[in-house]
């Protein structure tokens, strides 16, 4: 509802964030339609943001080649605005992992179709992207885990074992993490709220700065992303 009002005001933020919400909910058709409305507006959303979300949606729809082109656009396309703002998304290991995963999807699809040449090509492309991630973040769990799959399918067992052990070494201790997290979340309610993957910020609440204690409680959801993209 909040994003619908933003869209009515003529801002691309409205349909763009609606697309993000729909995507998080698994409504891919709704996400596609909302994103199309966003890119049709003037001004348009940043091209790298719309390309990233388009890639996410396309991958979930099984359009892996489309996803690859969109993720490559985020990482490599140079635009006047991007250069002016000095954005370098080539260091964004989240998007690079997504690109590698899309290549891996293509490799698995080629394998199912008994296309060995295509399978090997896409496995090597996936390998390249995941190894680039490790030059940025040597402890990246997603890259190590996916490289296990890549090397297993390439038949290079020693490399698969190397990344298997690295994944075990760098994987957080979930039990220890939960023991530390629960008391902290109970002690700091505001931090607990902000730590959720989808954060619901109360627009009006008792005790809020500038509002009377009897202020009615209203809320709107804002989805947060661990990503360099705005």
Predicted regions and their residues:
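Structural marker of alpha-solenoid helical repeat scaffolds
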Residues: 7-9, 41-43, 77, 88, ...
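Residue-level recognition of tetratricopeptide repeat
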Residues: 11-13, 45-47, 81, 92, ...
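TPR/TPR-like (Sel1-like) alpha-helical repeat modules
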Residues: 71-76, 141, 148-176
